[in-house]
UniProtKB/Swiss-Prot annotation:
It is an enzyme of class 2 (transferase). Pfam families: Glycos_trans_3N, Glycos_transf_3. This is Anthranilate phosphoribosyltransferase. One of its GO terms (biological process) is L-tryptophan biosynthetic process. Binds 2 magnesium ions per monomer. The keyword Amino-acid biosynthesis applies. The gene is trpD.
Amino acid sequence: MDTIFNKLFAGQQLSLEESQTLFSAIIRGELTESQLAAVLISMKMRGEHPQEIAGAARALLDNASPFPRPDYLFCDIVGTGGDGANSINISTASAFVAAEIGLKVAKHGNRSVSSRSGSSDLLAAFGIPLDKSANDARQLLDEIGLCFLFAPLYHSGFRFAAPVRQQLRTRTLFNVLGPLINPARPPLALIGVYSPELLMPIADTLNVLGYKRAAVVHSGGMDEVSLHAPTQVAELHNGEITRYQLTPSDFGLRPCAISDLEGGTPEVNRQLLANLLQGQGKRAHTESVAANVALLMRLHGQEDLKANTEVAMHAIYSGKTINRVNALAARG
């Protein structure tokens, strides 16, 4: 471990294997708090490299509680959080709509980072249990098309880093790991990041981790596809990464203001999402969710974003998507 420390403190990049060794030790509680703080700040100051991020993610995945991985195509839609936008839970709403149109979504989530309520806070407000066993969650994925995997249940080693992260009060590598350590290991993912500077590093990391197809997005300060600003995309497809930009017109939609997407407490967000999934949501909410679902559909090979948006809008306005929420709550 001293060799790894010395490389870090000299400003040198770690290999994937070295990063994996380091983070395996971290999540086993083998570093002191001062050592961990020094490691995280050293990496932050020079910038974390994709090989280092991938090594950390592999350490978390290798030590995660197991999930029975399906042999059918499935995906995740998730953001890093930390964008400060305090928006409604767009990725969570998008997961329900995606399931309604036939996609399989194993959504990895945690408590709030950037909004007043994260995906897990919102699910709890709906009465959806967060403590499902891996086998029960897999059954929900099979039968309802959607399951939620609560990060602390699968990644208990995070607890060793929590005190230092709270004391540092700054973003570190741990802030970008969440979307990369889904224990179901989906082959497809739509991942939002809090800074455009993370687009290529995270796309490169997804390539190293072996994702089949994925899109990393940022839009005007938000960690998702948004309609208030152009969405910057780094798309991974069969080992190649392409950068491009999307605007509302690419989805056949009109722009909205960022203030139109503001959320609130878990209970407020629960009501906003319930209205949306019953086909009675605000235009900005409905269309923002539809745009995210449209890009997720593209990752499944349905390339026409405007047609995809129409499919998603039809599912939302049918009012039937709320049945997915009720079905998950009933299985508590």
